Amino acid sequence: MSSILIVGSYGSFTNELINKFYKENWRIYTLICNKKLIKPAHVFEQYVFKYDSDSVRTLINSSRPDVILFTGAYDSYYKWEDESAVEDSLNYVTGLSNLLMSAAMLGTRHFIYISSEKVFEDEYIIDIKEDLQTSPNSVKGMTISQGENLAMHFNQTTQMEVSVIRLAGMYGIPADRKACRDIYSGMCLKALVSGRLQVNAKKGLSALFVKDAVEGLYLLTKAPERKHVIYHISSLEEVTEDMVARLIQEKLSNQIDIVDQTVGLKSRLILSNSRFLEEFPLEIRNSYKDIIPQIIMYMNRHKNLFLHSDEKYQGKGLGHRVLRVLKKAFPFLESLVFFIPFFILNNQSVGNDYFGGINFYLLYVLLFAVIHGRQQAILASLLSVIGYCYRQLYSTSGFSLLIDINTYIWIAQIFVVGLTVGHLKDKFRDMEADKNEQIDFLSERLNDITVINSSNIKIKNYYAEKIISSTESIGRI
């Protein structure tokens, strides 16, 4: 039985890979980074580590997969958002380097690196073939292209076979809003949220449905040999944004406005898959005309998974916004409410033989500084100063209050005590968070060791049973 290690977070792409290889009687291992993800039923063993972790070498040594497939350009673990693009790029390259190095050292037969059309970001008028020089401009494109170069370098310098597969605009039916990362589901989401689509009729594109992509990958993986290092898998079904927008407008129940923003010369981004089709018998079975209506139908049935509470068609936006504002304003309202009894107590204690020496405003400031920290201590101090000045105006004029040095001493005392205690509270809170973070890190390392150990035992038992059941084993003799 052949085995494969699929590296990448679970999603429509990874799930299709798992289902396909399971049907073909492969043993499936997965490597993910998110502990919250649930292991699919067909996965033999799941590992949860960072791709650049030292544990990667151990798990590859334990599982000994025939093939390692790195989902790379389509791994949903990498968000590629503006604020995190550089960090994602560093993690991507270091993770891929660790995977390639570990696989090569441990004798993995075949490593598959999944790339995409993002490595070509210039404008083209002809179909793009595998030998054309890449032209990335964005951080994501440059990172994926760098991953291709790294993979091809290992193919040339090690005994391990490495294949680079560019999947052209792969799309699927998204499970939720976060999964709307391809061109088609992204346009469907925009139409659902805003009821408006901006299109460029001169921009040609081609997208590949995830099931067709997985079928092509399986054909390449099971082949005894491959003639080339780089392959394109594409649908070659050329469409424009306005064609997709009109189909969405036709199928979506809500009114959709299409805004034509056609500018510039005609351009197209179509990857030629002639090299792949010459070597492997792939048949593209799914068209965007059939899949986009399915995407729209799924989104309409599960709007709660795709729309935020304050967005159009949700219906409960105002109530949720008010609730969020109230939650944020609660500590401030609490300070105002508690100020009233302290203000009354302070006024009643003036001239009292028993309570005259108690500074109720100082107690009030200390209470909120200890409970909430520096921010609420500042508000409590301001309210205390207002209450103090208001009480002093009973017996003196405003001008006399302004020039009285005792007023400023009292104000300084309140603020110094409040800010000091509030600062200590915030510092203790940060120290507690750092301590918990360190405990979580050490616990995670311990869990990693435990998982690897349990996995090794499971694999050992599997092979022991296989040896005993063999017709040539000593146990059967």
Regions found by a protein language model. Name each.
Residues S135-S163:
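Active-site Tyr-X1-5-Lys
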Residues V199-L307:
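C-terminal substrate-binding subdomain of Rossmann-fold SDR/epimerase-dehydratase oxidoreductases
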Residues K50-N91:
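NAD(P)H-binding glycine-rich loop region in Rossmannoid oxidoreductase-like domains
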Residues V67, D82-F111:
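NAD(P)-cofactor binding segment of oxidoreductase domains
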Residues M152-G204:
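NAD(P)-dependent short-chain dehydrogenase/reductase
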